[in-house]
């Protein structure tokens, strides 16, 4: 009994001393912010797991009270200064990712979750070449071909309602599945595009905070037979099937890798690029290749679907916007059967403006981009942030900051056409300086060119060939972001952007 009392007193004394240190003696004690955040990381757990994906929104709220620099964890600082973004995320910055977030998606050895800067650069090199602009433009006829099939299928549903989210989710899966893995999923062939890939990334995303704070959860899941996991969590059944298909493809490629350099007619995948790279043999295992594939699909599906569906919603919800876009497309492409190339589509000012607004409001990544500098302090005005302190900024705030954007929560393509196509922010700086939907720096979005090609071809083809589309029982709640699970999510249970094909 005495031993228990001694243990209890010792624990109380420990936590009391720890609290005093974190509040008053810690190197970040001079940084303003909520005291609970300074005391413990469990406050973040409460908002992101118990409440559900709300810590990002609390950060935005707290900045209004505490100012542009704020302590949001025992060893983490957050900035909300649009002019500091490019200074913080420079292309030459050799920042590290916090190791404790490595397993938030369960892809611990994939490029995206690579912690070390130099290790990340080595892993990124073969994939960067694979997703370069020249490679994507070379592949763009296939993107157009698949989009043609999608739009043809949409036209077949005349008089019926389809979900834009599901349609473009299916399209993205077919495009990325073939380009990256050499697999044909034929997702757009499913009735009303309700393919197996639908909603999978959202279901996985809702586990991201659990994986970040409690990485052992994924370890336990891997130790349980797949049949049992599928019963407990039905969405996992689709993921297991995807993993099996990817594993089989990797085994085929590994079996024939001796002749990789001689393969001329076979479609080269990310697996070929990685296997033909200068990476260490330990990087070329089937397990790591599978994790790379899962990470890539997760990154592509949710962001592409969200951005395209959001664009369709706002274009249809604003008749003047739809009219201007259709007029521009008709003028540029008198024959709807002949869609311009990606470089030509990029020169259409109103289409480009609609795409930029969709990217701005869809955000891409809603969670803060966390980094730390192990070698040197980070300076922000009069604040010196010590080495090894985690810091970050949110795209959510950067892309909707009222100090930069006029009417930031509205879809206004015209903002991009002002000043002869060189629009200025409210502070007088070029607006492009603050437009960061793909992030910046050495860890910027790998799939930017693929995403832009899909958006240009997808929206141009849809609105040039399908003359009458109308929102059906859909309001702004279908695209309003209400939760952050690394990617932005709309209200749970939403039916998405539903469109009547007339």
UniProtKB/Swiss-Prot annotation:
Lineage: Eukaryota, Fungi, Dikarya, Ascomycota, Pezizomycotina
Gene3D superfamilies referenced in this protein's UniProt entry, alphabetically: Cytochrome P450
Name of the molecule in the record: Cytochrome P450 monooxygenase orf6
Matches recorded under InterPro entries: Cyt_P450 (IPR001128), Cyt_P450_CS (IPR017972), Cyt_P450_E_grp-I (IPR002401), Cyt_P450_sf (IPR036396), Cytochrome_P450_monoxygenase (IPR050121)
Glycoprotein is among the record's keywords: yes
Family: Belongs to the cytochrome P450 family.
Binding positions (heme): 445
Membrane topology, record value: Single-pass membrane protein
Gene name for this UniProt entry: orf6
Provenance organism: Eupenicillium brefeldianum
Metal-binding listed as a keyword: yes
Any one GO molecular-function label of the UniProt entry: monooxygenase activity
Purpose of the protein: Cytochrome P450 monooxygenase; part of the gene cluster that mediates the biosynthesis of brefeldin A (BFA), a protein transport inhibitor that shows antiviral, antifungal, and antitumor properties. The proposed biosynthesis of BFA involves formation of an acyclic polyketide chain that is differentially tailored throughout the backbone.
């Amino acid at each position: 009994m005495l031993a228990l009392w001694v243990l209890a007193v010792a624990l109380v004394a420990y936590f009391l001393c720890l609290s005093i240190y974190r509040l008053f003696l810690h190197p970040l004690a001079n940084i303003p912010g909520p005291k609970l955040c300074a005391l413990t990381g469990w406050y973040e757990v409460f908002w992101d797991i118990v409440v559900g994906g709300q810590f990002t929104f609390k950060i935005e709220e707290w900045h209004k009270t505490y100012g542009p620099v704020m302590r949001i964890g025992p060893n983490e600082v957050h900035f909300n200064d649009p002019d500091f973004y490019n200074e913080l995320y420079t292309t030459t910055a050799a920042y590290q990712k916090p190791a404790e977030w490595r397993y938030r998606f369960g892809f611990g050895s994939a490029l995206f979750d690579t912690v070390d800067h130099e290790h990340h650069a080595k892993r990124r090199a073969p994939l960067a070449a694979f997703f370069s602009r020249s490679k994507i433009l070379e592949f763009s006829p296939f993107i157009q071909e698949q989009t043609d099939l999608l739009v043809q299928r949409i036209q077949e549903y005349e008089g019926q309602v389809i979900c834009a989210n599901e349609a473009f989710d299916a399209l993205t899966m077919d495009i990325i599945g073939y380009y990256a893995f050499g697999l044909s999923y034929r997702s757009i062939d499913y009735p009303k595009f309700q393919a197996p890939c639908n909603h999978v990334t959202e279901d996985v995303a809702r586990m991201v905070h659990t994986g970040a704070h409690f990485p052992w959860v994924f370890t336990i899941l891997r130790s349980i037979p797949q049949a049992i996991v599928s019963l407990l969590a039905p969405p996992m059944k689709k993921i297991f099937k995807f993993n099996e298909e990817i594993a089989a493809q990797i085994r085929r490629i590994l079996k024939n890798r001796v002749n990789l350099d001689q393969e001329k007619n076979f479609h080269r995948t990310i697996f070929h690029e990685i296997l033909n790279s200068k990476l260490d043999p330990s990087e070329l295992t089937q397990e790591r290749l599978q994790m790379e594939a899962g990470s890539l699909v997760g990154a592509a599906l949710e962001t592409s679907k969200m951005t395209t569906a959001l664009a369709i919603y706002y274009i249809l919800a604003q008749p003047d916007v739809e009219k201007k876009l259709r007029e521009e497309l008709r003028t540029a492409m008198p024959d709807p059967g002949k869609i311009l190339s990606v470089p030509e589509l990029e020169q259409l000012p109103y289409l480009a403006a609609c795409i930029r607004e969709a990217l701005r409001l869809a955000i891409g990544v809603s969670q803060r981009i966390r980094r730390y500098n192990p070698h040197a302090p980070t300076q922000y005005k009069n604040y010196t942030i010590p080495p090894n302190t985690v810091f970050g900024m949110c795209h959510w705030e950067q892309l909707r900051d009222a100090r930069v954007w006029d009417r930031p929560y509205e879809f206004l393509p015209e903002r991009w056409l002002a000043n002869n196509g060189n629009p200025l922010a409210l502070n007088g700086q070029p607006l492009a300086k603050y437009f960061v939907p793909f992030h910046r720096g050495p860890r910027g979005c790998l799939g930017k060119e693929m995403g832009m090609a899909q958006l240009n071809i997808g929206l141009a083809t849809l609105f040039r060939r399908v003359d009458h589309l109308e929102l059906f029982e859909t309001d702004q709640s279908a695209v309003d972001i209400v939760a952050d699970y690394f990617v932005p999510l709309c209200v749970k249970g939403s039916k998405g952007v539903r469109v009547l094909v007339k």
